[in-house]
Amino acid sequence: MAASFAGTATVVSADSGDDNTLTVWAWDQNFNIKSMQMAGEQYAKDHEGFSVDIIETSSDDCQTKLTTAANAGDYSTLPDIVLMQDNSYQKYLKSYPDAFTDLKDMDVNWDDFGKLKQSYSMVDDTHYGVPFDNGAVIACYRTDILEEAGYTLDDLTDITWSKFMEIGKDLHEKTGKYLLTSEATGGDTLMMMMQSCGANFVNEDGEAYIVGNDVAEKCINLYVDLVKNDVVKLVNNWDEYIATITGGEAAGIVNGNWITATLMATEDQKGLWQITTMPKVDDVDTATNYANNGGSSWYITSNCKNVELAEDFLASTFGSSTDFYDAILPVSGAISCYLPAGESEVYNEPNEFFNGQSIFSTIVEYSSHIPEFTKTPYHYEARECVNTAVVNIVNGTAKEDALQEAQDTLAFKMTE
């Protein structure tokens, strides 16, 4: 599906054939595409004749088409600009470096973005992407359930996971509810724990690093204990995950801030939810109460015929405009990772659903504290391996055996 904005050009291929039009691949009509549409409209106000032609392309299709073009040695099918998920981009940049244009000459103050967000789209200190949506992790709690057990949001702010477990066990005994829910093999809780310590399940050389990784073992031990002590409810899939939250079976959720859209769809729970920081891992010097889960960035491909225009467009909108981020927030729900945006009046408006909290400015502020960590092109493979290990340990497998299997499986997947 193609959509032309701020102009009348019609997309017939990835090449618009118009020096003043940029083609874009992106997904999600109401979020990413709407934001790009509004960016095009804003830029066109000062650049007569400018337009963006947006071709709706799923995230998977963006990756598949990029791979197909690279394998054919022909990048002419690529658009000028493509949206890519932060957790997958490194894999494609390292595999197909000729597919992208570096942003060495772009006029952007990169310090206006959190260091972790920048690092997703960097290689060897060179920027390749303009950060877009914010993936900062938040902890959300049903304050009515907390109060039923005798707790407030302050009791769960800036705490450790051991304190979280203490509260969670008490809450379960008093209410029968869980303090947290997580998907068994597809969940991100363990990955967020690791990232909050500035760590990962790979070493600096990109090799599988689970066995012998002290931080990994601490996180896995914590996570297993949380499950075994009825603090975390493991569920089988996303639908069950959402059902435990909206149905009131779990009093809390730790995830990327995009989860707020799901919570806000439950109108009958308006005013009952509030957000705060996630717990941090005990006895790890680098541990913090901040992590990232999700997010994406915009990239200029090597097929772009007018790189100067593409750079100026992205720099003038996504790269520097608080007015732009103020405009898209109420329309698309896209929360900025551009730090100055968090200081605006729009971002500081109280949110009724979250009991009057100014959640958007808070989320932007959280994103500035997230530690950097070693990236891997095999993020999702690592997630599957360690989550499977946790399930196996909970079901009775010896921890050493489960972790060794996870290590071996991840190492094998890295060779495929």
Task: Give the residues covered by each predicted segment.
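Short, low-complexity disordered leader/linker segments with a strong preference
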Residues: M1-T23, K45, Q404, D408-E416
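C-terminal lobe and pocket-closing loops
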Residues: Q90, I259-K270, D282-C385
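Extracytoplasmic "Venus flytrap"/periplasmic binding protein-like
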Residues: Q42, D46-K115, E148-G150, A251-G252, ...
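Extracytoplasmic/periplasmic solute-binding protein
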Residues: T126-F132, V137, E147, S162-Y209, ...
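Hinge/lid segment of periplasmic solute-binding proteins
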Residues: L83-I138, S162-I167, M192, C197, ...
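Conserved C-terminal helix/tail region of periplasmic/extracytoplasmic solute-binding proteins
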Residues: E147, L153, S344-E349, S361-E416
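Glycine-centered hinge/linker elements that transmit conformational signals in sensory
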Residues: E166-D170, G206-V235, M278
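Short, well-ordered beta-strand elements
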Residues: D18-Q29, F50-I55, D80-I81, Y128, ...
